[in-house]
Amino acid sequence: MANHDLPRVASRFNTDGQGATRARAVGVMLYALRGTPFIYQGEELGLPDAKIPPEQAVDVDGRDPQRAPIPWQPPSVAGPGAGFTTGTPWLPLDE
């Protein structure tokens, strides 16, 4: 249902503010299918795509929003690295 080249499910199906509900429905469908489910980082948490300003974009194909680091803690608690790093991440973390 998703991979590193597609917007995260919570963003892709959020046309009317129902992204979280639809992401849960997609998760239920995915786990009900036969075989091994594969999920990409952030999908298991229902994270939406990160909002990356054009001047901070790294990928010319525009795939940075779904490749941003997963925040381990809120930036308000852990600082600008959100518990992910004490350095500067390659891509900015979403609030």
Language model regions located:
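Loop/helix patches that line or flank the sugar-binding groove of alpha-linked glycan CAZymes
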Residues: G17-E95
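Active-site clefts of carbohydrate-active enzymes
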Residues: M1-G17
